[in-house]
């Protein structure tokens, strides 16, 4: 009787789960994917499991220093991992897999502090509990080794982007519009891949929508579409030194948080809420376009992934900003390359788990600024 799955060509080949909960903190995206040496990854299932508002509140509160942090962090990590386990069980059910068919779960965790300049990054997680709940090997803590090697620990997705999205003869940019925007530059002639965080994206857009719509996000960018970009406010937002800093660089809610936004808005109390939303949309678009113009002026095609790919108003703003910056690039989502935009980040962490299992580096030192490429992650056996 033929085997359901052929013997792998490489000992690390097989089926992996990838889990990613980003800076928007609305839930966890998961994928089940088969990696085989010499072949493109094959997605077997995808799932999204949302977070209760109580968990979101706990995670947001941990973004800034506060009382009783160790206890609050530990309890939030356990609650977070129970949602991760639900996502894994859904992937397993949808793909029709037994536990023994899953090589490992690659899980990012939830970033609550990212301070590489001080030598650390903290992703909230309890991988031991996840291994217990799923009875599958878990690979986690992907960022700390890069930071230990002098890097920013972010972004890590560019190595995966280069593997899946690169094309000889065409300079491409992959732009992730999650809570924070970041870009990966894939040179046409096989030069060094580069990548870095550009600035805020959904983190501030969602925050403003929650305040003024009572909803977790601006559905389809409709709130922003009702407004007009306020040029003086946009200039004030872009005055943040991070935007002018050279790569390698990374950022997060440590900088671009509600307190930062409120401080910038203090001198613009007269600006209508919908105009603020339109201006925050422009901030995301302009900050990305300026970086592309500076570091990838020959880009012919830009592909968007992340939650922002579902915001047509943001995509239109990005197209306009690229045009104004003199970048003649087409703009599409990664779906045009065969990978739905909501899958890309989770796929990257499944791939990092695959790389760990093969004992192959997962970072790119040219991206993160680390002393060299390193094997990333730590194993929690089932």
Curated annotation (Swiss-Prot):
Enzyme class: transferase
Pathway it works in: Amino-sugar metabolism; 1,6-anhydro-N-acetylmuramate degradation; Cell wall biogenesis; peptidoglycan recycling
Listed Gene3D superfamilies: 3.30.420.40
Highest taxon of source: Bacteria
Pfam family, one: AnmK
UniProt catalytic activity: 1,6-anhydro-N-acetyl-beta-muramate + ATP + H2O = N-acetyl-D-muramate 6-phosphate + ADP + H(+)
Binding site for ATP: 22-29
Keyword Nucleotide-binding set for record: yes
GO terms of molecular function: ATP binding; kinase activity; phosphotransferase activity, alcohol group as acceptor
Protein's UniProt keywords contain Plastid: no
Known EC number: 2.7.1.170
Keywords, in A-Z order: ATP-binding, Carbohydrate metabolism, Kinase, Nucleotide-binding, Transferase
Gene Ontology biological-process entries: 1,6-anhydro-N-acetyl-beta-muramic acid catabolic process; amino sugar metabolic process; peptidoglycan turnover
PANTHER family: ANHYDRO-N-ACETYLMURAMIC ACID KINASE
Function description: Catalyzes the specific phosphorylation of 1,6-anhydro-N-acetylmuramic acid (anhMurNAc) with the simultaneous cleavage of the 1,6-anhydro ring, generating MurNAc-6-P. Is required for the utilization of anhMurNAc either imported from the medium or derived from its own cell wall murein, and thus plays a role in cell wall recycling.
Record family assignment: Belongs to the anhydro-N-acetylmuramic acid kinase family.
Protein name, entry field: Anhydro-N-acetylmuramic acid kinase
Native organism: Burkholderia ambifaria (strain MC40-6)
Gene expressing this chain: anmK
């Amino acid at each position: 009787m033929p085997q359901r799955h052929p013997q792998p060509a490489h000992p690390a080949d097989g089926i992996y789960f990838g889990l990613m909960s980003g800076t928007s903190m609305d839930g966890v995206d998961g994928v089940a994917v088969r990696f085989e040496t010499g072949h493109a990854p094959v997605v077997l299932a995808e799932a999204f499991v949302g977070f209760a508002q109580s968990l979101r509140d706990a995670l947001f509160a941990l973004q800034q220093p506060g009382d009783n942090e160790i206890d609050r962090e530990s309890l939030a990590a356990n609650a977070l991992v129970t949602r991760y386990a639900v996502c894994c069980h859904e992937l397993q059910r949808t793909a029709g897999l037994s536990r023994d068919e899953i090589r490992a779960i690659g899980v990012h965790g939830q970033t609550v502090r990212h301070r590489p300049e001080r030598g650390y990054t903290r992703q909230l997680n309890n991988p031991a509990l996840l291994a217990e709940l799923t009875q599958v090997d878990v690979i986690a803590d992907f960022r700390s080794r890069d930071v230990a090697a002098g890097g920013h620990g972010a972004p890590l997705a560019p190595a995966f982007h280069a593997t899946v999205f690169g094309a000889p003869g065409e300079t491409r940019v992959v732009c992730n519009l999650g809570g924070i925007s970041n870009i990966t530059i894939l040179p046409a002639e096989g030069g060094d891949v580069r990548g870095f965080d550009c600035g805020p994206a959904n983190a501030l857009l969602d925050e403003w929508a929650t305040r003024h719509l009572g909803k977790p996000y601006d559905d389809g960018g409709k709130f922003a579409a009702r407004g007009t970009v306020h040029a003086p406010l946009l200039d004030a937002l872009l005055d943040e030194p991070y935007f002018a800093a050279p790569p390698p660089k990374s950022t997060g809610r440590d900088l671009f948080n509600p307190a930062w936004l409120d401080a910038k808005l203090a001198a613009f109390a007269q600006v209508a809420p919908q105009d603020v939303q339109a201006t925050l949309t422009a901030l995301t678009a302009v900050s990305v376009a300026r970086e592309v113009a500076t570091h990838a002026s020959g880009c012919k095609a830009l592909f968007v992934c992340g939650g922002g790919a579902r915001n047509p108003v943001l995509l239109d703003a990005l197209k306009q900003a690229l045009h104004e910056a003199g970048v003649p690039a087409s703009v599409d989502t990664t779906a045009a390359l065969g990978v739905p935009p909501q899958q890309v980040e989770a796929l990257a962490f499944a791939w990092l788990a695959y790389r760990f299992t093969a004992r192959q580096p997962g970072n790119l030192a040219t991206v993160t600024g680390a002393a060299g490429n390193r094997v990333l992650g730590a194993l929690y056996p089932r």
